[in-house]
Regions:
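Glycine-centric low-complexity/flexibility signal
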Residues: 1-5, 9-204
């Protein structure tokens, strides 16, 4: 993971520089392309299994690692294998496990594809987008659309010098069944951790 620790006995002069660990935390969800119109007319759900061919995948966070994750440094989706346990109850659906973002729900394979939720850390992650609609449905949103948004990851409620965590990854968005590349619907990684202890600091 992305952890940087600086322990300086004397003065730490930043000389106008900084340490950037954006995207170095828990990995985002690797989106999955369901075959044909398998993911069609499904009710909104907080959790479902990959075997059910429903909804989008959850991200990685303090509660665990799903089967499909996304390495945004290489733009590669990683499959941990069919025997990977993943999350209890399943790796897909809008529910957010721990500080990881939930996946967007898919009401229909060709429309109503909800966006994945953002990862959480100091505060909770944001909801995903309402969802993409094709031409005949463009601009029409219903109560069901609201339920399709992936839920953002929870805030880490009790950070302390001896207890910090990386930012949760973002959930995957609905990948329409038109053959779109799942990489484009995968979630981004959360932020890493920087710990600094110094006698004094300057040049910030």
């Amino acid at each position: 993971g992305g952890v940087v620790v600086l322990d300086v006995a004397g003065e730490l002069n930043w000389n106008g520089q900084s340490v950037n660990v954006a995207g170095r935390g828990f990995r985002g969800a690797g989106a999955v392309q369901w075959p044909g119109n398998a993911d069609a007319n499904n009710p909104p759900d907080y959790v479902a299994t990959l075997a059910s061919n429903q909804h989008s995948t959850k991200a990685e966070g303090i509660a665990g690692t799903p089967r499909w994750v996304f390495n945004q440094e290489t733009s590669v989706r990683l499959d941990n294998g069919g025997t990977w346990a993943g999350y209890a109850g399943g790796d897909t659906g809008r529910g957010a496990p721990g500080n990881a973002g939930g996946g967007g729900d898919n009401r229909n394979g060709t429309r109503d594809n909800g966006g994945g939720g953002g990862g959480g850390n100091a505060t909770f992650g944001g909801f995903g987008a309402y969802g993409w609609k094709n031409g005949g449905w463009a601009g029409t949103f219903t109560v069901a659309d609201f339920d399709l948004r992936g839920i953002g990851g929870a805030a880490f409620a009790s950070p302390a010098p001896a207890r910090v965590v990386m930012g949760g990854g973002g959930g995957a968005g609905g990948n329409n069944n038109s053959g779109a590349d799942p990489v484009n619907s995968s979630g981004g990684a959360g932020g890493g951790v920087v710990i600094v202890r110094a006698g004094s600091m300057s040049g910030v």
